[in-house]
Amino acid sequence: VAAEDFMTGVGRNCMEKGELLKMIKLPAPAAKTSDAYLRFIPRTEMDIAVAGAGVSVTLDDAGTCIAARVAIGAVAPTVLLVGAAADALIGTPLDDDALQAAAAAASAASSPITDRRCTAEYRRQIVGVLVKRAARIAATRAKGN
């Protein structure tokens, strides 16, 4: 089962009754590939994220993004892979315009709730900021800086 298909809902996964997960196999990353994960936790006494974002990028020798994946969490019932955000990064030097487009796509894909910790609108905004920051960090790491 592909990792992105494992979780099927809040507290649910694709395993049938009696099945046991015994191994997770991850491919080795390609050269000039790196990632970053950020989460926003406004209250230090609770380790519950208001929003989270993970970005993986692969760069060519010129520094152009040739592959990307963007995932967001705590802004929908399950973690979301946001293909439109990844597409906004691919083919670019990961400049401000590309990062802003990825952030906007992530915000648009989110479907957060309002709860005691913050409003849905705030979560929608902060997840875009986290995507932008995580993409910058991943790019810096992929360049070897």
What are these regions (language model features)?
Residues 1-145:
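C-terminal structural segment of proteins
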